[in-house]
Amino acid sequence: MLLQFSVTNHRSIKDTAIISLKASTDKSLVDCLISPDEKKQLVPVLALYGANAAGKSNVLHALLLMREMVCGRYAKLLKGELLPQEPFAFTDQPTQPTSFEAIYFYGGIKYAYGFSFDKSRILTEYLYHWPNGREALIFSRENNDYQFRENIQEQFTLAGRTAENRLYLSTSNEWNCPQTEKAYLWVFEKLTGFMGTEMRLDAALSAIRQGGAEKSRILHEMLYADLGIKDIRITGSKEEPIISALHTLDTEDGTSKGFWLPLGQESVGTQRFFSRIGMWLAALESGSVLVVDEIESSMHPLLTRHLIEMMQDAAINTNHTQLIFTTHDTGLLDLTLLRRDQIWFAEKDEKTMQTDIYALTEFSPRKGENISKGYLQGRYGAIPFIGGNAAWAE
């Protein structure tokens, strides 16, 4: 479970931006809250609003880039290969480091992991945990100067195998380091998502191929969404699957006749929901942190709402899955769906071009306040200015 993520000097984010999933004292929708231990409560969903080009997607991009650097395509760079730094561009100052930090729970233990980097090397890296409720260092790194608390000699050997453009959390786990294993596994197993309009079909296809209960869950959701699809089959090769959906028509003699339609001929919204629901069910099964940019893309608002309701329902979300998403859908600004501490905003300063991230709770909205109307009227900022005036709605 993710408690907090912070990012500094990434794309439109110059100064440190923080999103927190720690639950406030809000007494509404308390049944949706999840608990990593007996003392803390977290929210399962965080929604991030903002105008186009405000920088809201850059927060999610940073979180997923952190994963890519730990265990994805940037985890095994060759010597001399450049790191994927995208620093804030609107400044005359020399390029500053970019930094990420995630505070999370895995196996009942709290961890804080972060690092800073430029285009050529990792500048700092650190990992702390709270095994008995007290903070303890696992390792820290400043350039190639390391500090360890356990298995010191062995870890110094692993540090010597860590190139300046690679993370120690990554290389130490290639050598099965027990001190960093669990912190690494959270990133590898629990952090997932996608940006923009990307359609990720791997989870849905895996469920269909497995058949049985896994396929039934996908079909149940497709039927629930009223998309007219009765079955889904996969032919072709694993590398080039051919996905078809079964539709039925009632004939004059009272029987039904089935027709298989290639998924590519379905509406974009249907294709999008199929890709989404596969990832949703996989995340709900594994208790992941699911990061989704533009959650409503091409889908009917009721389908988007249903996906969020699944995460908010404690009877469905039994493994403490979390969802972090960006959206423009003001219909989701509904206090019967989301708590006030689950709604966040991104706003860009037109003078400095910097993105500011802040929570709805900073405005202390009333319990029955119409959040959607207030947002469109500019009460919380983070909206476009059309012709020099704030967009608004009666």
Predicted feature locations:
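Electropositive, glycine-dotted interaction segments
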Residues: 112-238
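Conserved ABC ATPase signature
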Residues: 45-49, 237-281, 289-302
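Conserved P-loop NTP-binding catalytic core
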Residues: 34-41, 45-47, 51, 60-113, ...
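P-loop NTPase motor core
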Residues: 91-146, 359-368, 374
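Conserved catalytic network of the ASCE P-loop NTPase/AAA+ motor domain
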Residues: 40-41, 93-95, 105-108, 281-284, ...
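Extended helical coiled-coil dimerization/tether regions that scaffold
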Residues: 8, 199-265, 385-394
